[in-house]
Amino acid sequence: MNYHTYFGRESAPVECCIVGTGGFGRSFIAQSLKTPLISTRVAVDLKAQTATDVLRGLGIDPSRIAQCATASEAKTAWENGHYIAAGDLSVVLDLPISVVVEATGHPEAGAKHCRLAIDAGKHVALVSKEVDSVVGPGLALRARNNNVIVTPVDGDQPSLLMGLVTWAEVLGLDIIAAGKASEYDFVYDPKQRTLSSNGKTASAHDFGDWIEPATLDLSTIAARRSEIAAEFPQRAVPDLCEMTLVANA
């Protein structure tokens, strides 16, 4: 795929608002500072000061950052070319932003943010799988009725799996199963005969017998490996959320 067919040299930057300035949000702003066709001048968190601190930490001149508590303040700051830090999404929804990136990871707050954004005519990039797995289909319908889009973000495991499955279906292949990697890796040490995961190590004397087992029955192999690794959590909430996204797709 040639991305220049989607983003021509004369394209205007997409104006974004990030909601949630934690790990993902901070990284998104940092990347947008280096990406010509993405502009993220608006950051929202529980406290405007939190968003301000993130913007400053990314090297943005403090004199160019405005903390805004009202829509009027946000409008003035935008017109003056400032970055905007707010503690309430509703304060910034009248600005000429095209996409709200929801990255709080909080189910109730995230659902509210999506509803507000959709009703304001903004597209939503829904990073918070905790939201998408519960109310994603409903949000998608609401967005469709408002002529905007709600979408998972490309590059995360759910979107990659959706792409792989639909690619296979277009080729005419029958999909009999789909899965994803766990949040944590399991590392087997054949010399010590131990299994390690997420900072914990445990004895796994029989695990080596199931690396290249004599049986080809996959269900038996998976069950035995799971039994040997019983001391470790093998499913996490993010795993379940992400697979629900794929199932809903």
Language-model-derived ranges and their functions:
Residues 55-56, 136-139, 162-165, 186-193:
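Short acidic, glycine/serine/threonine-rich loops at helix termini
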Residues 58-62, 143-145, 168-170, 193-196:
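Short, hinge-like loop/turn segments at secondary-structure boundaries
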Residues 16, 20, 43, 131, ...:
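Catalytic cores of large soluble enzymes that bind and process phosphate-bearing ligands
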Residues 1-116:
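N-terminal glycine-/serine-/threonine-rich beta1-alpha1-beta2 phosphate-ribose binding loop
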